Amino acid sequence: VRIFPSLLLPLLLTVFTSAHSQDTISFGGIYDLPGAEVRATYTPVSPLAQRFTVEEVYRLPGTFYDPARLVALLPGVVQTNDQANHLSVRGNTPNANLWRLNGLAIVNPNHTANAGTFYDFPTLSGGGVNAISAQMLGNSGFLSGGLPVEYGYATGGTFDLRLRPGNKTRRKYQAQAGFIGFDLMVEGPIGDSGKTSYLVNGRYSFTGLLADMGVDFGGESIRFWDFNAHLHHEWDGGELSLFSIVGASSNVFAGPDSTEQEITEQKELFDIDFDSEVQIYGLSFSHQVKTNSFRGGFSASKVKTDRSQMPVNISPTRNAAFFTLDPGLFNANFVWEKKINEFYSFKLGVEYFDQTTTYELSFGNGGLSGGAGYTSLAPFVGLVYSINGLTAEVGIRNSNYFNTPVSHSFLEPRIDLQYEWNRQSLRLNVGAQSRGLIAEDLMAFPLPEYAVLTNHLDLTYSRRIGEHIVKAALYCQSTPNDVGFQDNSFIVSSNSILEFDPRSPDFVSAETRRYGVELEAGGGSKQSGWYYRGSIGLFNAETQQVDGSWAKDRFSNDFNGKLTIGREWPRLDKKQRETTLGLNFALITHGGERYGRSIPFTSTFDDSRRFFAPQDFSNGFINSNGTYFRPDLRLYKTKTRKKTTTTLALDVQNAANVQNLGNVYYDAFLEQPTERYQLGLIPVLSYRIVWR
């Protein structure tokens, strides 16, 4: 059993945490709602969650109606490549993140999980487009630091997405058309009781429609479709939800004929097909009996990805390459909460987590195949105390990992202390949380550890001044039992791993840490004028080396900054109908992702491995992509009519067409390091209509 460092254990004797009426900075003003009103829209599993609204997903620039891209505007979050929604949270690898839907853990719910990655390999944590439609979501949240005792299996960020129920009185429709895709949503009651509803949404990609008509983009055709369904039933004191998310995507690249067109990079030597499928099913419920409440559910989800790379012209040095990655996840949880009196409440529960992943990687003359996974059972208990501006929760979680070569059992204390006075608040959050090492287990066997424990401490001060809130946060994370591999004498930890590495390295024990400071301010109101939200963070992510020194990790970007500004102008048209013009502007900047040297792949195999040359880290992450900067713009016009509300919007990502470096790889055809750039100016026009 691994115990949280003893110097922090005395804090367990301190009352701690959360103020449910705490002011929260939003994109358009300040959430300052009574507790009951907040709960009517989104009940965060913990006040630690930074909640966001679906309206913000629709309104803010650069989101493309993807909640993950909205989360990229939050403090401490870096979008690793703007072609996709992989997020590094406070210097952690995106593999440290976890997606939850209605409180249940699910697999990566994104199409084209290979988007924006180093060698077009699929990943376990992000992708180009989210398969969960924003039209299905209620207001949701994101946890970037400590977790409540109910949640685990993530040491980076946790997406806490919530499905909204359908309308229980009459049928309603929504339709949306744009350069991302075409959506059609239908919701309405089932029966006459007014207690049961359905909500379904179907979507097909705009690029897929163009591909069906024979149009491609630089030799590539990209398609995706998804279908979301939610059945909801409520009764006095309780509710039941059944949901499903299914979809598929493909990205097909046709290499040019070298006799007709000059080859400019190694990619053009091949025909490349990428296909993926996602399936997510779940059930969640809650019920209250007097002072007792019960909630829980289960989910089953899986993803299947298949990438094939066939040479346009067969030759001994241009072999085919195939890669499949098929993760699956089953999750179940149950929580019992009891309100003891006006000051105390108690919670007790358990979470079951079973994750398996299989893969096959073939380079022509050789390859790798296998699987990885683990099963975990985590009972937990918590106590909440609140009085006179002080709210406290103390919890302990016991995460047990088995069905691995080495079993692990972690005690994970969770404490969170917050005190409010005179429009100010001070919060201390201390805890530990663990996660299994799936990506690392796929790359090497055996591992020194199959699950790791991360300790963290967050200290946050906030103050409200009129319509404005300012916040300052200090945080640190430590993973003393991390794993990594050595390249010469340099240790590359798991915190620098996102994609598959074809070298199959031998892993060793490692120690990692992340620490930083965040400053944030927000205020104004879209109802009354201009509003803004801005943040800046300074941070480091490091791994201890053999000589005891600390070296920067891949996602140690040094700094990140965001600023969003917006305003709406309501008016009446000539027929006295409501019309609103809106403007939103966002600036995003951060330090560059780090990388090693790009060199040829030396291997005894004479096959396509040379087209997937891994970086040389013998001298560490000595290079950087340089400062990233991107301005986004969104203009929209909303018309409210008797039976409909329509919105015409122009969303422009990278409005200044800034050239940002994405990565540097070794091109075996050109025989030199080659730069890839992130997205330039991307205009997205959309039209949305809601029938009331």
Feature map (PLM): residue ranges:
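Short, acidic, small-residue-rich periplasmic hinge/interaction motif at the N-terminus
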Residues: Q22-L60, F64, A68, P94, ...
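A beta-strand signature from Gram-negative outer-membrane beta-barrel systems
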Residues: F121-K172, D183
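Transmembrane beta-barrel wall of Gram-negative outer-membrane proteins
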Residues: G178-Y204, F217-A254, D271-A300, A332, ...
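Outer membrane beta-barrel strand-and-loop segments of large Gram-negative receptors
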Residues: F323-V335, G370-F380, Y450, H456, ...
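Gram-negative outer-membrane beta-barrel transporters
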Residues: S386-L390, C476, D501-E593
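C-terminal beta-signal and adjacent terminal beta-strands/loops
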Residues: T589-F612, G626-R630, K637-R692
